[in-house]
Amino acid sequence: DYKSQDSDNEFLEILAEGGYQVGELAKYYYKFHYPDYHYADITSLDYQESIRATNEALEHENVVIAEPAITFDNFFIRVDVLVKKGNTIKLVEVKAKSCTSDDENDFLSFKKTGVSIQSKWRPYLADVAFQTYVTSQAFPEWSITPYLMLVNKSKETNMDGLNQLFTIVQTEENGEMRLGVEVNEEEINASKEKIKDTVLQDVNVKRVVNSILYSAPLGNDNFFDLLNRPLSEFGTENSSTFIEAAHQLSDAYKNEISLDKSGSSFGACCSKCTFCYQEIIPNYNPEEKYISSIWKFPKNKIPELFEQKVFSIKDLRNNPGLNPLNPNTKSYFRQSLQIDLTANNDLSEWHSDDISEVMSEWNFPLHFIDFETCTVPLPFHKNEYPYAVIASQFSVHTLKENGNVKHYQWLADQSPIDPTIQFVKELKKILSNDNGTVFMYANHENAVLKSAKQRMLPNKNEYKDEIDFIDSITFTRGEHEPERAMVDLCRFVQDHYYHPLTNGSNSLKAVLPSIMATSNILKQKYSNPLAFGTNLENYTLFQEDAGIVTDPYDLLPKLKDLISKDLDNALFHKDSLKDGSGAMKAFQVLQFSQISEEEKKGLRKGLLNYCELDTLAMVMLYEHLNSLLKK
């Protein structure tokens, strides 16, 4: 790999998806399905030792090998599972991704123009295709059938405690801290038959892999166009195949050759790429506002605009004939507003004519809520489906009509029990005491509560009060809504308010620092230590550095200060929980891994701080909007 700016926490992505646990379960799945085969688990991370151990295991006529090391030319791979019967090989790539059947066609898109691979499956099929190629070259005498091993979300689990069989642990090898899985061998072996028929699903992908390797050239709308910019452009010919491109890239990596991207076209996701965005745009300026930041801008139009030398929002404003935005869409007004204000360097806030009328319909006390959740591929309990939403934490700020604010919070303890139902019970205690309007930011909270209801329905008599509570505040768009249906503040902002400093984003993380930069009432109130709160009481959230307002999220204590002076030895390496995915990963670490009490307390404190500020940010947004109307 080329070094990514985000690579320090790539292991957390795998952890959050349940990749470690699914990978370990897959080993036992094949081990138990082939009880008469020799079994070898190649655990060494050393190149030479892993290759030696693999070759030793391959001397067996029939063998199941977990994580074998295979090398060819400049390539070195670790296959997840390899099943060998003579020269007949089952090559398995394990992914903690969901499927609904063993049909390879589920990965394909069938259109009048032809058959193609669905974009969401391209990275995974690329992976298994590459592994198949390397293995076939290293062992040309083998007959290889590639498989993707996935999690079938339509399968109920057949046992209790499946998730708890695998615990994430931290190990040290050659001075480096790495993640591993501690397996409850006794319980695993006692559940052999259930493990063989659990939620995992292997899918034969030989036809697709053969098409990738030997038929389809790289190019627009073809397989490996992951960035909407074919890798073949890095080669000498536009018809470079997948295999040729792989060799070109490996040669560049081996010889430390920087790939020339100056002639490359601009793809839909280049603006988020950590590698070459600055190289593609002439005279790149990080302070400039580029067209990719326009709200709901059609990313597929960016390449042709770049060819016309239209890079920035000002460029687009100066070339109205090249503007691809559709005036018949609901987003057009807001897009045009962003373009005009940005091009004119105008920081004026906009609000709709009816914003006051809409806000007058809200009932005090106002409740601002935020949930933290995670999904797990391996269920906690029998008869549950994979990827159920686990509700792990909430924060509620309640604002009374006299301006008084009170904060409530709840965070699940580390426990083998799914906390979702207790989560609902605790939330109900807070929100059922009045008829005040409940606010969320985006639809997440609505979806979480509706998901929790579905899990309660099999025992609806036992959970009648909780189900009635959920029904009183949740809704389905397009259907009749209850009188107290939650208000989506994000949608409210989209429809009624715009601040130029958000740079087109409606995220609360963008809205909060923007309003703080221009709001007198927020400066007046939050320049003093907070007189309320659970974790944030006495914090001063309005601070300036050289005349620039500091993002309040950056004022929260760093995790290294909450956990340990030696953060490198902590399992969780992120220094803040500024985004929801960081919070989700932190809870995953708390729930499914073995960590020190010091790290556990620090992570809990960080989670509580972060979630409390999320709902306080919603209070601050309301206070700012209310002050605008009073003007």
Task: Locate the predicted segments by residue.
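DEDD superfamily 3′-5′ metal-dependent exonuclease/proofreading module
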Residues: D1-K631
